[in-house]
Amino acid sequence: MASFVIEGGHRLSGEIHPQGAKNEVLQIICATLLTAEEVTVNNIPDILDVNNLIQLMREMGVTVAKEGIDTYSFKAENVDLAYLESDKFLKKCSSLRGSVMLIGPMVARFGKALISKPGGDKIGRRRLDTHFVGIQNLGADFRYDESRGIYEITADRLQGSYMLLDEASVTGTANILMAAVLAKGTTTIYNAACEPYLQQLCRMLNRMGAKISGIASNLLTIEGVEELHGTQHTVLPDMIEVGSFIGMAAMTKSEITIKNVSYENLGIIPESFRRLGIKLEQRGDDIYVPAQETYEIESFIDGSIMTIADAPWPGLTPDLLSVMLVVATQAKGSVLIHQKMFESRLFFVDKLIDMGAQIILCDPHRAVVIGHNHGFKLRGARLTSPDIRAGIALLIAAMSAEGTSTISNIEQIDRGYQNIEGRLNAIGARITRI
């Protein structure tokens, strides 16, 4: 098991480019199964979760070719349906959460999908009900094989339907959407997720011949078509990585420029960091973060403590709350971090407390952070990364700490961040992989 050794206290300086968005590319790769024609995807990040899904596609019989440093082509002309029933395939699915989004394309195009309970982060309960109920509403049958621990989903031809989702699930909406584009008739999805990832998926599917309207809203209408064709698609920059770099700059008192961020797709992320007192400027499609010796958390107009909470888009993505919590440990003032959507993502705060942070964990969803105003540095420590987002938050803490820190289980970080130590070392960090 690999680890990072981080020498804290070094300022960063220079330019850094965000990778392609992990949450988008997992959906896009699954969507290539909807056509027998070639689909070319640009700006694919070289990270563990994505590479595992690409390898899974190869094993399914999809022709995958690496066309450039971050460009792949996919041609699902001869999918091996027998392999999809093998224990090897099902075992791989169980270790990759993104595999759940294979259900919609497989059922829509081939009439059948088998999948085991998918893996991924251990950040609390992530229900699959939205996926299953939505695809059932399109006419699919679900059967759970208790002896093998797998779900079998079958359908002769999916039928369009109206559905009101009980939660604005990003992956659930994507799965239903990918199934509905080849269904007979019209499908209406109300309370659909509308994150930029979903907007990108919708636009790609429309270029492939789908008929989707209501893009960027929570009401999607899909008129089913007989078949889709090939296309080209470019993945957006990863907004989570952009936010992570803003947090790193603040914690290490650094001046950096984050290049080509697709600013219009960042939503309220920049404003959320400004509420913590962090200065940043939009320069074209870049974000410039000046060096700040201190930053002060804002208060609400009535003087009450600032609250930073996640919410479905256009609210703040839950994937950045771990970073914002760490950033607040060195701010002037206090903030309540409210993680509404998952109940275990704050369970890494004990590690920050061991490093000297002042944090009160109120319950599994809420933590109050009392900032040090950079008056007391965090201390280097031996740490373990429990999930992707906590892992990057701990890395930020270690980079700002006094002394040396070690982070183990960095495979979790590798799942979501491409060559993170190489890119950060290039702008002044001191991180060694051992």
Curated annotation (Swiss-Prot):
Its EC number is 2.5.1.7. Gene3D superfamilies: Enolpyruvate transferase domain. SUPFAM superfamilies: EPT/RTPC-like. Keywords: Cell cycle, Cell division, Cell shape, Cell wall biogenesis/degradation, Cytoplasm, Peptidoglycan synthesis, Transferase. InterPro entries: Enolpyruvate_Tfrase_dom (IPR001986), Enolpyruvate_Tfrase_sf (IPR036968), MurA_subfamily (IPR050068), RNA3'P_cycl/enolpyr_Trfase_a/b (IPR013792), UDP_GlcNAc_COvinyl_MurA (IPR005750). The active site is at residue 121. GO terms for molecular function: UDP-N-acetylglucosamine 1-carboxyvinyltransferase activity. It catalyses: phosphoenolpyruvate + UDP-N-acetyl-alpha-D-glucosamine = UDP-N-acetyl-3-O-(1-carboxyvinyl)-alpha-D-glucosamine + phosphate. Pathway: Cell wall biogenesis; peptidoglycan biosynthesis. GO terms for biological process: cell division; cell wall organization; peptidoglycan biosynthetic process; regulation of cell shape; UDP-N-acetylgalactosamine biosynthetic process. Its main location: cytoplasm. One of its GO terms (cellular component) is cytoplasm. Phosphoenolpyruvate binds at residues 22-23. The keyword Transferase applies. Belongs to the EPSP synthase family. MurA subfamily. HAMAP family: MurA. This is UDP-N-acetylglucosamine 1-carboxyvinyltransferase. It comes from Bacteroides thetaiotaomicron (strain ATCC 29148 / DSM 2079 / JCM 5827 / CCUG 10774 / NCTC 10582 / VPI-5482 / E50).
